[in-house]
Amino acid sequence: MACLAIAALGAWYAASFINPAQLTKLLSSSVKESTGRDLKITGPVSLSLFPSISVKAEQISIGNASWASNPNFLTFKQIELDISIWPLLSGNVEINRIGVSGLEMNLQTNKAGEGNWNLTPPALAASSPPNQASNSSSTGSTFVALKTLDVMDARISYQDVNQAVKVINLPKASIGNSYGKATINIDAQYANYTLNLKGKSGSIRNTYFAWGQAPVKMDLDLILTLNGKSLAITGEVDKQPQTMAQFKINLNSKSFDLAPLAGSAVVAGAAGKAGPTTTHQAQGKYFFSDDALPFDMLPLADGSIKIDIAELGVPDQAPFTNFKTTLQFKNDRIDANDLSFNVGKGKAQGQLSISEFSSPSPKISFRGMAKDFSLEQIVPLTDSHARVSGAATQVAWNVKGSGISPHQFVSRASGAIQVSVGQGALDAKFINKGGDFVITVFDAVNPLYKKSTQTTLECAVAYLPIKNGIVNIKDSVGFVTDRLNIVLSGSINLNSEALDINISPTEKSGLTTGIDLGGLVKVEGTLQNPQVGVNKTGVVNSAVSIGLGFLTGGLSIAAENAKSLATKVQPCKTALHSWSDIYPTGN
């Protein structure tokens, strides 16, 4: 009781000379010293003594970077600070807990790639021993004793230069620090996605203050739940001063979807930017997006991330199963040499490499093969009018290129891709999902396509050699349906995305009326806006045949029919190349 009375007396004594206006001034100067930003409190400030000294303030703001569009980096409807008594007597503010409601955080980057969240961190005392630097509470920094952060009803907006604003809502978030450990429980919402991150890690506060100045070891034991599916994150991070961070992380899940994560990872990972990034002015006119990929969020580090997901959700198709790989990080290079997963009843394997990702033009290469599956096995059954039956499929790819965006990458790419599809039946709506280019091709070769509900496919092969962003198709794309043999030739410029594709369909009977309407057609325009044009060479050839038919009383037409019957076209066999030339066996 005596100790309690003494503590209460000390609290009363400390509070007896605390003037809210003076405390506001002290807090403002402390924030300015710690962050380089101005703190303003325009609402009422109140003080309570028990169970600890607590200051509650309303309508608070912290200033933004000078170049930012919003004058405030942070605003709060209300903030409550639990303050340590004894440091206060000597003129220092040490905060054990911060409770926040109605938080608005405005994150933004400028044209130089700088983020407005780059606050000036307090420097650790040079005289502190390394093993004490991350745990000492006597450095004189304002928030060094912060143990708990509770946030309610928060809204975080992020805007990259020349991009639309992205918004994350935090209904609640709590981060507690005790005995060198952090307890984390965060609920977040982004677009149609809900996220919860829960678990324990090394002290976030200690890691922040000691990073790059003292040795840091941070263990991770977290559960990320995304739209009801959970991913276990375990491992450790080791950072020594003047050296690159090292880490070993494991990601394990019974079932997880990566599609929602892609939408929120860019925003959530933005706080991990270490400095200026390469700017890129995107153009929205391309089929392959010209928006910059978030290479600047990849860590410059040495380490590995081992991924083991039993069922991986993939957009618009059945999930992959037994998805496994290990990402190896080495400076600004990432390699995945053991990528494997099951697709349908088949298997896929491959390798991926990203290098020089801190440069203006990262290099990317990927190769692999998927086989022993069918389109029927991977097409979801959500739409009864877009079904597929059969269609055994094999795919191989070996492509390398460079660039900051998908468009830059394909415009500089070289390599080859091959797809082979066997006998099957394709609903019209399934074909329509192939996009404008596929629909344009089918319309061109079969004017009755729109009136039919299903296409009977005997085979289809597409071999696409790529050299410096140019796809040259020389009878290397072929289709065979129950009625037609179809061969495509021409080119695709992946830089301009211009199309120059000639279509050569013939009746499987080998008979012709003398006028090959398909031979008169070509696909022009761009991948984003394909159009049907006129094949001038086909027009000339057809005109000659028609003219000769009139002159010879139909003998030239009969000759064409005889020639067609004698030389049967085999589009798939002609188009197919050796699989080992694309993805050598044994890889």
Predicted features by range, described:
Residues M1, W12, P215-T225, K229-L231, ...:
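Extended terminal
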Residues E33-W67:
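N-terminal leader/targeting pre-sequences
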Residues G36-K40, S66-I83, I95, N162-I175, ...:
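Amphipathic hydrophobic-ligand
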Residues R37, E58-A173, A245-L300, G424-S452:
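Secondary-structure transition motifs
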Residues L88-N92, P360, P406-S411:
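Short loop/turn motifs that connect adjacent beta-strands in outer-membrane beta-barrel proteins
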Residues L124-K217, Q283-F329, L457, I466-N468:
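Elongated, acidic membrane-bridging lipid-handling scaffolds
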